[in-house]
């Protein structure tokens, strides 16, 4: 009846069977389609199932199948992420419950919990590194490791080095003309009064040096200690090696060592009545720390130390004086 549409006869019949946007495919899509045809001539991808899915998404999805699995940088088709497996959760470190009942904690040799044992190992490593640093500083500054032996010029050297190492404000003028003994006799509060900005930190570092010197003295071949001559109950002033023929030093012997050196440890422990053997622990934390250093137990605290002291009540070595006071004790057999 009517003639065909003017433009219809000029269109290839094969184009009539394809979707409109196939004609406008890019060169990249044609090349990809050709490559696929060479590799697998017996199979070709199906066109989009629905009109809403464009050919661009279709070809991207198809190209995604050609990439190796480890090409995580390659572009993924919309919805491809839904096929991915959920990421694995990072492995959690075991948590030690320090509040758990005593019966539920794992114990290591020595009666310590696993947590305490690990803490002591770490602290021992830290102490070792600190001692190395102090030894290095002594060589650089040409000073002794014991602050008690420092001259005023040695004190100034140590102050400059500590300020530089730990980025502290200049404090040399605040401690001029002070020798090592005078510096060691000062309290933390006195350090703060002389240097409000860094006095407390400086006092802490000096305390580390004093402890290190004390450790070195105790472990040196010529170190002398006080031990029982016959039994724990009958101790004397004789100076003998702390090993006592292979036996470790006892706490009461250690306390006596501190008491007999008031110039070094008078701030921590002192005699109230030496003739009667009455003494007072002024700084329980420091005494416990020194005892921990001696026994190589960095996690030592006063709770543990006081339990050991109370055990001496039954053995007749230490007791509470007639007028009971906090942190005041009496040797049953005075000097």
Swiss-Prot record:
One of its GO terms (biological process) is epithelial cell fate commitment. Coiled coil: none annotated. Residues 129-213 form the PNT domain. It is found in: Nucleus. Pfam families: Ets, SAM_PNT. Residues 249-332 bind DNA. Residues 1-25, 75-100 are annotated as: Disordered. It comes from the Eukaryota. SUPFAM superfamilies: SAM/Pointed domain, Winged helix' DNA-binding domain. Its main location: nucleus. Residues 1-20 have a biased composition (Low complexity). GO terms for molecular function: DNA-binding transcription factor activity, RNA polymerase II-specific; sequence-specific DNA binding; sequence-specific double-stranded DNA binding. Disulfide bonds: none annotated. One of its GO terms (cellular component) is chromatin. Keywords: Activator, DNA-binding, Nucleus, Transcription, Transcription regulation. Expressed in a very restricted set of primarily hormone-regulated epithelial tissues with particularly high expression in the prostate gland. Significantly lower expression is seen in other hormone regulated tissues such as mammary gland, salivary gland, and ovary. Expressed in prostate carcinoma cells. May function as an androgen-independent transactivator of the prostate-specific antigen (PSA) promoter. Binds to 5'-GGAT-3' DNA sequences. May play a role in the regulation of the prostate gland and/or prostate cancer development. Acts as a transcriptional activator for SERPINB5 promoter. Interacts with the DNA-binding domain of the androgen receptor. Interacts with NKX3-1. Belongs to the ETS family. This is SAM pointed domain-containing Ets transcription factor. It comes from Homo sapiens (Human). The gene is SPDEF.
